[in-house]
UniProtKB/Swiss-Prot annotation:
Organism for this UniProt entry: Mesocricetus auratus
Coiled-coil stretches noted in the UniProt entry, renumbered to this chain: none
KW Repeat (keyword) present: yes
Comp. bias intervals (Basic and acidic residues): 1407-1416
InterPro entries: Collagen, Collagen_superfamily
Residues bearing glycans: 1230, 1356
Gene: COL17A1
Record field: compositional bias (Low complexity): 60-74, 657-673, 738-751, 778-799
One GO MF term attached to the UniProt entry: extracellular matrix structural constituent conferring tensile strength
Residues spanning the membrane: 469-489
Residue numbers on the Extracellular membrane side: 490-1431
Quaternary organization: Homotrimers of alpha 1(XVII)chains. Interacts (via cytoplasmic region) with ITGB4 (via cytoplasmic region). Interacts (via cytoplasmic region) with DST (via N-terminus). Interacts (via N-terminus) with PLEC. Interacts (via cytoplasmic region) with DSP.
Organism placement in taxonomy: Eukaryota, Metazoa, Chordata, Craniata, Vertebrata
Gene3D superfamilies, per the entry: 6-Phosphogluconate Dehydrogenase, domain 3
Region of interest called Triple-helical region, as start-end residue ranges on this chain: 570-1417
The protein, known as: Collagen alpha-1(XVII) chain
Amino acid sequence: MDVTKKNKRDGTEVTERIVTEIVTTRLTSLPPKGSTSNGYAKTGSLGGGSRLEKQSLTHGSSGYINSSGSIRGNASTSSYRRAHSPASTLPNSPGSTFERKTHMTRHGTYEGSSSGNSSPEYPRKELASSATRGRSQTRESEIRVRLQSASPSTRWTELDEVKRLLKGSRSASASPTRNTSSTLPIPKKGTVETKMVTASSHSVSGTYDTTALDTNLPSHMWSSTLPAGSSMGTYHNNMTTQSSSLLNTNAYSAGSVFGMPNNMASCSPTLLPGLSSCSSVFGMQNNLAPSSSVPAHGTTTAPTAYGVKKNVPQPPTVTSTGVSTSATCTTSVQSDDLLHKDCKFLILEKDNVPSKKEMELLIMTKDSGKVFTASPASVSTTSFSEDTLKKEKQAAYAADACLKADINGDLNTVSTKGKATSVENHNYDRGGGSGGGARGGGGSGGGGGGGGTWGAAPAWCPCGSCCSWWKWLLGLLLTWLLLLGLLFGLIALAEEVRKLKARVDELERTRVQYFEDKTERSSKDRLLGDMPGVGPGLGKAELDGHSQEAIWLFVRNKLMTEQENGNLRGNPGPKGDMGSQGPKGDRGLPGTAGIPGPLGHPGPEGPKGQKGSIGDPGMEGPIGQRGLEGPMGPRGEPGPPGSGEKGDRGIAGEQGPRGLPGVPGSVGPRGPNGSPGPQGPPGSTGPQGLRGEVGLPGVKGDKGLAGPPGPKGDQGEKGPRGLTGEPGVRGLPGAVGEPGAKGAMGPAGPDGQQGPRGEQGLTGMPGTRGLPGPSGDPGKPGVTGPQGPQGLPGSPGRPGTKGEPGAPGRVMTAEGSSTITVPGPPGPPGAMGPPGPSGTPGPAGPAGLPGQTKAQRGEPGLAGDSFISSGSSISEVLAAQGVDLRGPLGPPGPRGPPGPSIPGPPGPRGPPGEGVPGPPGLPGSFLTDSETFFSGPPGPPGPPGPKGDQGDPGVPGTPGIPGGHSHGESSSTTYRQGPPGPPGPPGPPGSFSSSGQDIQRYIAEYMQSDSIRTYLSGVQGPPGPPGPPGPVITITGETFDYSQLASQVVSYLRTSGYGVSLSSASSEDILAMLRRNDVWQFLRQHLVGPPGPPGPPGVGGDGSLLSLDYGELSRHILNYMSSSGISFGHPGPPGPPGLPGTSYEELLTMLRGSDYRDIIGPPGPPGPPGPRGPPGVSAALATYAAENSDNFRSELIGYLTSPDVRSFIIGPPGPPGPQGPPGDSHLRDNYSWGSSSSARRGTAYSSSVGMGGANGGSLGEGRTFGTGDGGPYGTDIGPGGGYGAAAGGIYGTDGDSFRAGFTGDLDYNKLAVRVSESMQRQGLLQGMAYTVQGPPGVPGPQGPPGISKVFSAYSNVTQDLMDFFRTHGAIPGPPGQKGEAGTPGPKGDRGLAGQRGPPGPPGPRGQKGDKGDKGDQVYTGRRRRSIAIKP
């Protein structure tokens, strides 16, 4: 890289060139060991036929002679010499690869000023493997040199400069090992200081030490094969001290290069970047007298190049020994020659390898303290050619060194390929002591005559010394030969062309003639052919006309044949007269191209033209555009006050006598102010003089010092208030606050209607009594419901460890409709607290006494714990959301007397007097308020915890307050105060978990009940695929027979007159057909029949519907149809999609709505716990449900199906199912459910659960038939719901749903009846044509939990809800104000307080509601809280 800088210093223009040279040498192999050399001139003795290749590349920048006459310039030579070392002691290591990378950046020399760039510092960074010192020698020497030489007086610069220099890169570079002579004497004024540091490896015994010395520097291992000044073998370096330790870049100037002693006299500090003037290069002693101090920067002044002494004086014309500033156009040869290093290695050059290090080369030549001549302008490389030098490649960049003042010599390059004899290389001119350019590069280039007497190029040669006259002559001759060759070639070519043209013309003529002849011949033939005729003589012949004709034809043909054969042609007649010229013929086709002539021989290459001499510097360019205005400089120092001393004050004139006032003269120009005279008596005021002309503006004074800062301005007035920002987006609901303090118990709500009595669950052993939860404020006494039978108090079971969540319990409705498996609250129930409310409700006890108004609700029974434990019990969730978990009580079963240990399920919730419901109690409490549970949209029930040990059947709690109360308050439905709500499902009293599990199961069952499922199905997200579908089991437990179903469907289709040809019927067609409303109804009514109790849960699809494989069903139907010859019409277009299920927001809104506020309202005080039922919660619930089945179910269903709850449960609406015919939103959901989900197995369950799969549990797959999404209702549901579950799913979306659906025997009639019944009960099917309500079948086993639409996960709804809540927190409805308590039922006897379930996700802490008033206040408080929280 060549960068030229121009600086003006001291009025002298100085041009510097920075030459950055990157040299990478790579040692790829070592020559054979056999190559030894005696080290003398004849290196031909190298063993092994070794070959020496030298490639020298010299970059020389043209010197510039400034006004002081010194040449400024620098040159570096990096030469790559591939040669075998003559006498290397390094062993042969062919496998080794040795790389050397050198990066040199040299700056031009500097004038003697100490300005910032005056120091000719060549930044040099090198990594040498030789030992390093703390601070590199080069740096130290460099600083020393700069300090001493920078200023003309050679005085040391200030300490700060020293510090600055030292601070630059103290140990940034590693210096080679110090030679014994490496101490740099402080250069004296007038001496030349040269310092070249060569990075080299300390190679001993063939080991290349390539340690990177400074990790801060880029990793770069630079090893040179040349011993770094250290004796290579046992040779000692017996040098006298060499001044300034010139480390020659190629050969150590005073070091023995190849281990031979160098008994040289100390060299003067001459700078020899190339071969140092005093070095023995190949072990030859260089017994040269020290060369003069002339900076022969590159001339190999006295080196023994190849073992040959070079006593080459420097041409005197170039350098006068004493003054180095005179035109020292010595050629600079820096032969970074590995030949001078260990030539035993073959070095390969890598040009493109960026150097990792920069070699800072400081070259300083100080002359009389003023001028530094870094390197002569002219650079020539001496080519050492010995007999052993087989090939030499030199590229010399030589600048014209003519001494041209103020002219920058440009870089001229001439590449010379060839061999130079040693005679040419060695100039034996005995002129000067200092080595001159071997070929007079300095002489000829510099205009000196000392460039060698012969062998030098003429002065006009631009390359100075790179070529000789005979080369030029040879070049000219070659050029002339080339030109002559070209000329002859052209002449020959022209002749060829001429011949070709003549030939072409001849061919053309021949062709034309041929055509003419042919034409003439043909015309003649025609004429001849016409000539024959029948002569008159023939006519007289005996031949008749016919024979004559035949003869004529024969003869004619014969003649024609002969003529064609040319036999009849006579001699040409005389040439006829030339006819008139015919029309010009068409242009002939171009002739075929002739064969290309042979290529001419390439002419001789012309001689290379001479390189033009350096042109004169061009005229000075026009002044460049004005540069952009620079940034304002720092404020200048205030200038000195303006010049000009104030004049002395004039002497006051004497006061003259007062003259008479003169006539006012015209105002003269204002005279200069005279020095005031003594004040005379005031004269009369003269007329005002004319105003003097404005003087020229004075020179602008220097800018005054900046004034002190002005006082701070007064603070601006406050700006007007900004416009009120638009209200921010509503913030996410805040974390659910902790439940507010319980509000005072509201007045008891009117007794809720007693729900149908649930079947009496087995009396659970009384669980340990849960710690009583804080009682809610007593609700207003509700009407006392009939007291549920008091369950035996279960002995409180010790809290069992949380069991695995049990399967969802089934709620047995009195009607026997399929139990809905409501997933119990997820999570194993928490450890059993003190006995919760009575254990599983035994048979409903007599109605509890009306709860006290808003007595504080006991902590939810253990079951609650379970829920809570599950962490996501629905009630918790709801409570957390501020929705009273106790939703509207499901129709409370008569509340059993509280089991002693396990709190009976709270009776029907009293009016929710409580403030925010505590964490949901054990599910029992939920269940107790089964509606309550649902009232808040139940959180997804956690997976039922493992059933805890069965508590002893709780002693029937005192009858809970009539469920009515609870109902009334919790749900919109009036809770019947009478019998306490269904006893909370007591878990097995023994453990919380049991109770929780039972409750969970109860809830699961309940949720799986048709009504709830229907409700949920709409609400829930698509049921997750239940476990693998179990065989579709009919309610009776028979495996569902697809064939039967198919036959029934086909029969129905036949009777209905559908006419789709079997050939065209596909599963899709059938599915579509099955989706038709009438078919759905048929399936629902006839096939499904009244929904039976939910089938046993399928394994995933244990519910009959769950495992219904709709695809299979459709295939069966097709098969059946094919066998029956029934054909269907194409399915009609799908009905409009059912309305979307309630969305989560809608649910929340609904739950918060006034209608459901009651449902959600704080549950009334728990009714007296029912007698502890058998531990199974479901049984207790069942009992309760059985006793209050109607109310209970209706309430539960109502609650669950209430938009609020549905919205809640649904959470975000599941993906809409395929469009079903519009149906009730539930149906629609179901449909979509069914269809979408039915395609998904999981949906079934959920749908079954959520969808209201008919079978409730049956729907294992969720889709079981009824369940399927639409579950049976799918069908019911709608056109969509396809076959039931198939509904949407079945055909709806996937045929395979079908498969999902019917894999086992399914009692379709029962299923349909149940489904329809449950749907009708819920009012879902009111729009449907059929209202068949079969007696509810026995509840089937719970189906596997379906995915709740809300949560879209495959799990129990409870689990889903719980998960959902865990994930998202309770779904905070904006906490509604506490719902008005239903008419508080009389407070039932307080069930044993269950242990307080782990608090549900804290709902937003409601503000304490006003006491009473149906607990509104509590909700109200909550709402207020939420309001406060809301953005």
